[in-house]
Regions:
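Amphipathic alpha-helical packing segments from all-alpha helical-bundle domains
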Residues: 62-65, 110-141, 147-151
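Solvent-exposed, amphipathic alpha-helical segments
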Residues: 13-20, 63, 67-74, 156-160
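Short hydrophobic/aromatic patch on the recognition helix
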Residues: 35-46
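Hydrophobic alpha-helical connector segments
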Residues: 55, 69-95, 150-153
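Amphipathic C-terminal alpha-helical segment
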Residues: 91-95, 134, 151-170, 181-187
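Short amphipathic alpha-helix in the helical subdomain of ABC transporter nucleotide-binding domains
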Residues: 3-7, 145-150, 154, 170-173
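Basic, helix-initiating cap at the start of DNA-binding domains
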Residues: 1-34, 51-54, 59-62
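Amphipathic alpha-helical segments used for helix-helix packing
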Residues: 93-116
Length: 187
């Protein structure tokens, strides 16, 4: 995605339209109109609906990672780190209007959306897990390789964000994730 004023306007407009009416009915023409740019500009910037959706996903996943890592202490123990990441991610997703709209009405977009990463397409779990794995300060306390541990975190968060009814509190979810990815304590 080009980082131009019009591309930013188009991404913001697409996000607004997703909040209002969802992804299925979204068109690039609507996005262009909402952004106040020509259809030609929209097509030049993104090519098609998938292009603008990938740009929205890239922007919003980046924002989620920033929000999730707020207050992260690389010197803290793994349980503290995982608890912070899991609870921040759940809070962020539950408060994200576009995520909630799509979760409630078009969850297939969350489960099967592909994001272009280099020459490959990765699903949301793969994309976020790769970002989380890169942020893991040390693999030493992990019972799994960093990417696998990150995938456990992402899949658990996504599961609890998609299906909110749970007997577990967010804190308990975070503690369960921490136990799942941590090496057992040596006594």
């Amino acid at each position: 995605m080009a980082n131009t004023r019009s591309s930013s306007q188009l991404v913001d407009a697409a996000l607004e339209l997703i909040i209002e009416a969802g992804v299925d009915r979204l068109t690039l023409s609507q996005v262009a109109e909402r952004a106040g740019v020509s259809r030609a500009t929209a097509y030049r910037e993104f090519g098609d609906k998938d292009g603008v959706l990938a740009a929205v996903a890239q922007q919003e996943i980046g924002a989620m990672i920033v929000a999730t890592m707020a207050g992260f202490d690389p010197q803290a123990d793994l349980t503290t780190q995982v608890t912070l990441v899991v609870t921040n991610a759940l809070r962020y997703l539950r408060g994200h209007r576009a995520f909630v709209r799509v979760r409630d009405h078009e969850p297939h977009w969350l489960l099967y959306a592909g994001l272009p990463i280099g020459n490959a397409r990765m699903n949301v779990v793969q994309t976020v897990a790769a970002m989380v794995a890169a942020a893991i300060p040390s693999p030493d306390p992990l019972a799994l390789p960093p990417l696998a541990a990150a995938e456990v975190v992402v899949r658990t968060v996504l599961s609890h964000a998609l299906i909110e009814d749970s007997a577990l509190t967010d804190q308990e979810v975070a503690q369960a994730v921490s136990r799942a990815i941590s090496k057992p304590a040596i006594s």
